[in-house]
């Protein structure tokens, strides 16, 4: 992905994400969502896949999104806003697939995620985070299918790539690419990242601002 992105774009993205990003809103239900303003880019994934860590790595602000070793801690849609010229917000979605949570809570999270995906006109893309150590699970496929049915554009981001051997990682990327052929709303390119060593972050930042520029 690096080869396809202009170095000037990567630098512009770095500067934008190094700006003043702040938490602005937490929504436990669609009734409490903030007014639609500008564009929104959301991050979805299984519990403990590294969504909050990725948002912190993107913005270079370790405390922006709260991280936790307890699966299922993020139970709301969390909105972050950047510099005035950014033109978009970041949305940290509740983690899914946490089997130990009460069934009523799982149902509530599922409803919130589905309603948000299907009714948010300002949402331009969902980045679905997949743990590079494990690949796409059944629960991930369920979410991808929901995105397909909702006609919401999404892209796969592999996380924790630093914890996978290079040969195994290449196989994981190939298998994920093949799996995406079944999903019409999926963007074909996969972003490989590590929040620990920041690999893939420049490319992901650049991809986001390129997308926002195209949709603005």
Curated annotation (Swiss-Prot):
GO terms for molecular function: GTP binding; metal ion binding. Residues 37-214 form the EngB-type G domain. Mg(2+) binds at residues 52, 74. Pfam families: MMR_HSR1. Its cofactor is Mg(2+). GO terms for biological process: division septum assembly. GTP binds at residues 45-52, 72-76, 92-95, 159-162, 193-195. Necessary for normal cell division and for the maintenance of normal septation. NCBIfam families: GTPase_YsxC. This is Probable GTP-binding protein EngB. It comes from Rhodopseudomonas palustris (strain BisA53).
């Amino acid at each position: 992905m690096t080869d396809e992105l202009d170095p000037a774009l990567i630098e512009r993205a770095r500067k934008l994400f190094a700006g003043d990003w702040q938490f602005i809103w937490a929504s436990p239900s669609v009734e409490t969502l903030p007014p639609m303003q500008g564009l929104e880019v959301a991050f979805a994934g299984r519990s403990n896949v590294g969504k909050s860590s990725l948002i912190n790595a993107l913005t270079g602000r370790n405390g922006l999104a709260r991280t936790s070793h307890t699966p299922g801690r993020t139970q709301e849609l969390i909105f972050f806003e950047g510099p005035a010229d950014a033109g978009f917000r970041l949305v940290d979605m509740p983690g899914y697939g946490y089997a130990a949570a009460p069934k009523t809570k799982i149902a509530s999270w599922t409803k919130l995620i589905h309603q948000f995906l299907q009714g948010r006109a300002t949402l331009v893309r969902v980045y679905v985070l997949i743990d590079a150590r494990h690949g796409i699970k059944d629960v991930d496929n369920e979410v991808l299918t929901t995105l397909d049915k909702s006609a919401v554009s999404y892209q796969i981001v592999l996380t924790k790539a630093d914890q996978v051997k290079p040969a195994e990682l290449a196989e994981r990327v190939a298998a994920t690419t093949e799996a995406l052929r079944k999903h019409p709303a999926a963007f074909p390119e996969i972003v490989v990242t590590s929040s620990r060593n920041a690999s893939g972050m420049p490319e992901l930042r650049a991809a986001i601002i390129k997308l926002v520029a195209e949709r603005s």
